[in-house]
Structures are given as structure tokens and as C-alpha cells.
């Protein structure tokens, strides 16, 4: 900052120049010594424009304070014919916007670009670049390992969920297979009733042993329509004539269209004689053990 001041004599005009790179602040104006009461109206002219900035009076306002800022040439004048007017202020350097921006950018570049200096005092830019590349590669490898591990964990979880779902489906299917629908039960009971009725009608006139074989084949062919009913085994036959009947008959899948493998064995073990077999629960008699079993299961719920 630099002090500034000048005198404007009566009837004269003074040009003022702030100077290159400076700003001029006019902060005060005062009247000089005078023996008569006098007043002065002050003017400033900038770019062909003349403006009044104040009035000085020895009796009332011998001085005035203000703050006028000029960055280019201007002119000062007043109307007093007997007394001079003194102006005072100060000058400061005007900052350049481009220089400030350049200084800031240079400081930032110096902070960012700090080279590695060896013992011999020379900067080693290649070594710094290699270190940066190594750091970037290490970070990338860690991130890729983390992603692979996460994807592996997700796949394991999905496999476990699928296995659990399949186990639940299998258990549901097995539970459904164990129970029989009412329609299937009705079909079986109706078939057994028909068989028992046929046996009752044929009881008075027993025929050749071949009739028992045919009935055994018919009963063997009446297998359940669902593959789930194949799990139910036929009950063991009662002892007739000191011999045991077939203990278990497994029925094949109906889709294959084959008759049971042990069909011949069942027919062979059926009674060959035309004698009657009485029911222990009621007074009815049957001409074969198979007919008695079908009757007992249908009428008396034998297991």
C-alpha cells in the first residue's frame, strides 16, 4: 500500500493516473487556509462524465471523508476561487486473475508430482511407475479372488437348496404313495365283491380244478393301476392241507404290460381239489383258498 495526495488550486483541473497494476482509493478532501468564508463544490470526471462528489465549507464542512476507487485515469476540480482543495488517499497493487490461477495450479502440480529421488539426486520415474503398477495389480487380484469366493459360496448355497427341495419332493411322493385314494379303494372292494359273489354261485356245483387256476390268474391280473400301490404285499395264505400258501406277491409296474413272474406259482399252489373252504366268520363256503381270502378281505376286513 502506498500513500497518495495532491492539491487542486482554484480554477484548475488535475489529472490523476493510478498507474499500471495499481488501484487508487480517494478517501478524504479538505479546504486550505482562507481569510474569507468560502465554499467549494468538488467534481470528478471519468470517461467524459463529470460528477459532483461533495461540497466543502469553512464554517460547516471544512473536510469530507469518502472512499472512491479508481483503476484508470480521472480528473479532479472544484468551484472555489480563493482556496485550494487537498485530496488524499492510498494506492494498492491490483491482483491479476490469471496470475493467481497459475500460482494455484502450479502448487497443485507440485503436490501431485513428487518424484522419488535416489542417493545420487536424480529422479527415478520408471521405478515409481513400476511400483504403482504393482499396487494396482495386487488390488485387482484381491478383488477377483473375493468375487470368485463369493460366487462359489453362492453356488454351494444354491446346490444345498436344490438338494433340500428334491428331498422334500421325494418325501411328499412317498407319503402320497402310502395312502390310497377313496376311488381306488372302492374299485378294489367292488372287484372283490364280484369275485366273492361268483364263488358263492359256483359253490353248489364245483367244477374241475382248472376253474381255480383261472380265478387265480384273474386275481393276479387285477393289479393296481398306480405304481405306488405296488408296494402293498398280499397277505399270507392260511394253511390248507398242512401246506403253506404264497407269503408275498410283488406286482410289476403296469406300464410294462407284463404279468407277475410268480403267477404260475400261485396257480400251482391253489387247491386242486373241488372241495369247499368254509369261512370262519360267517357260514359261507368257497371252492378255493383265493376266493376265501378275497371274501375275508372284502367283507370282514382281514389283513
UniProtKB/Swiss-Prot annotation:
Residue stretches of biased makeup (Basic and acidic residues): 119-133, 204-217
Organism listed in the record: Zea mays (Maize)
Keyword Metal-binding: yes
Molecular functions per Gene Ontology: hydrolase activity; zinc ion binding
GO cellular component terms given for this protein: nucleolus
GO biological process: chromatin organization
Region (Disordered): 100-282
Protein location: Nucleus, Nucleolus
Family note: Belongs to the histone deacetylase HD2 family.
Lineage: Eukaryota, Viridiplantae, Streptophyta, Embryophyta, Tracheophyta
InterPro entries: NPL, Znf_C2H2_type
Segments of skewed composition (Acidic residues): 100-112, 154-203
Keywords from the UniProt entry: Chromatin regulator, Hydrolase, Metal-binding, Nucleus, Phosphoprotein, Repressor, Transcription, Transcription regulation, Zinc, Zinc-finger
Subunit structure: Multimer. Possibly forms a homotrimer with HDT1 and/or HDT3.
Protein name per Swiss-Prot or TrEMBL: Histone deacetylase HDT2
